[in-house]
Amino acid sequence: MVIDKNKIEQAIRLFLEGIGEDPNREGLRDTPKRVAKMWEEFESYREMNMTIFEEVGSYDEMVVVRDIQFYSLCEHHLLPFFGKAHVAYIPDKKVCGLSKIVRVVNKFSYRPQVQERLTAEIAEYLEKELQPKGVAVVMEAVHLCMAMRGVRNPESITVTSKLTGRFLECQKTREEFLNLINSHKKM
């Protein structure tokens, strides 16, 4: 997707005027450019090469990367939601570098969306690229659209999950994953 920085700048200028602000005042003068640059940066996360290693007969146990910090925007109010993603897969002859898991989370996070779709997109992408025996994604997030407006409940955490393959079919595998991602939490 191509970012149209001029349209973003115009829209932000109109938005500021719409809420009664002067887009030419000192603190806001460069805001339209800053916002356009921010979206350009977000767009750069979408481009990534998934380096995959063929590991015939090698590691076939669960790989978990937990507590991946992520930031996204609620598509309904354009307010941030943020939290932690926990991602696992069980290799079937293919593995990827651990940093690629974080990059996949970033790839899908930096855009307006709902958490449910974000969770599913991460799992589906890993399923397609790695062709593993299973993928598990759990995301925990605070939604500012619920904290700052509406119900105004800043303490609530939304948890979504997407499980495929052995994580979905085998209770022991699912329990192992959940134990691994929760083992560090205080009781």
Swiss-Prot record:
This is GTP cyclohydrolase 1. Zn(2+) binds at residues 74, 77, 145. Pathway: Cofactor biosynthesis; 7,8-dihydroneopterin triphosphate biosynthesis; 7,8-dihydroneopterin triphosphate from GTP: step 1/1. It comes from the Bacteria. Keywords: GTP-binding, Hydrolase, Metal-binding, Nucleotide-binding, One-carbon metabolism, Zinc. Belongs to the GTP cyclohydrolase I family. It catalyses: GTP + H2O = 7,8-dihydroneopterin 3'-triphosphate + formate + H(+). GO terms for biological process: one-carbon metabolic process; tetrahydrobiopterin biosynthetic process; tetrahydrofolate biosynthetic process. One of its GO terms (molecular function) is GTP cyclohydrolase I activity. It comes from Sulfurihydrogenibium sp. (strain YO3AOP1). The gene is folE.
